[in-house]
């Protein structure tokens, strides 16, 4: 208030930063492997079962430090579905990030088969298409840092754990750097 004798107030904040802002270490981008786990209900009639907020879960901080980019820069550099699904796509252009799925053989698939950025995934963790023996999926919203996992109702098995590997691939000066997020989906 203007009649307060301490006005104008002076405040100082320390030990804090903007939400999602990360202290980036010096050096070149590196690869990263990180993991998440979630318990899910195999009897659920809903397709989406859980959404990870990668920013709040600390995953984006790890990726930001590995790629040497702020989370907001990663979101802005993440390619749209139409670019990635284009015929002949083999990886992101310089300065760009593509979301893929690391298959059990180590190859990265960019053949999106779920809504937007995402994949229907076979029981062994390889990229597939809906209805062709696939039971689980993930979808990614780059702007919201939201990674949603789910299943085809009636297809997932109680007592089974499915492992999937959503992967962000960053191209820096022609070299591809991968952030592999291994997710264990435990169905009860």
What are these language model-derived features?
Residues 6-129, 183-188:
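Solvent-exposed, low-complexity, repeat-rich "mucin-like" stalks and linkers
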Residues 108, 127, 136, 145-147:
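Hydrophobic residues embedded in beta-strands of well-ordered beta-sheets
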Residues 121, 131, 148-150:
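Short structured motifs
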Residues 150, 165-169, 184:
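Residue-level recognition of well-ordered beta-strand positions that form the cores
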Residues 173-180:
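Beta-sandwich strand segments
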């Amino acid at each position: 208030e203007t009649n307060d004798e301490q006005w104008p107030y002076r405040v100082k904040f320390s030990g804090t930063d903007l939400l999602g802002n990360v202290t980036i270490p010096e050096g070149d981008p590196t690869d990263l492997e990180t993991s998440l786990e979630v318990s899910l209900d195999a009897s659920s009639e809903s397709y989406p079962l859980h959404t990870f907020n990668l920013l709040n879960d600390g995953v984006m901080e790890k990726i930001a430090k590995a790629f040497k980019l702020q989370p907001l820069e990663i979101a802005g550099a993440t390619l749209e579905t139409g670019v990635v699904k284009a015929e002949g796509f083999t990886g992101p252009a310089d300065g760009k990030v593509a979301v893929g799925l690391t298959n059990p053989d180590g190859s990265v698939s960019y053949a999106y088969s779920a809504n937007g950025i995402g994949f229907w995934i076979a029981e062994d963790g390889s990229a597939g298409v809906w209805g062709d023996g696939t039971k689980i999926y993930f979808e990614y919203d780059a702007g919201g840092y939201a990674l949603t996992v789910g299943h085809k109702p009636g297809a997932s098995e109680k007592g089974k754990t499915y492992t999937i590997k959503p992967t962000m691939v960053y191209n820096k000066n022609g070299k591809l750097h991968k952030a592999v997020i291994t997710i264990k989906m435990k169905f009860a």
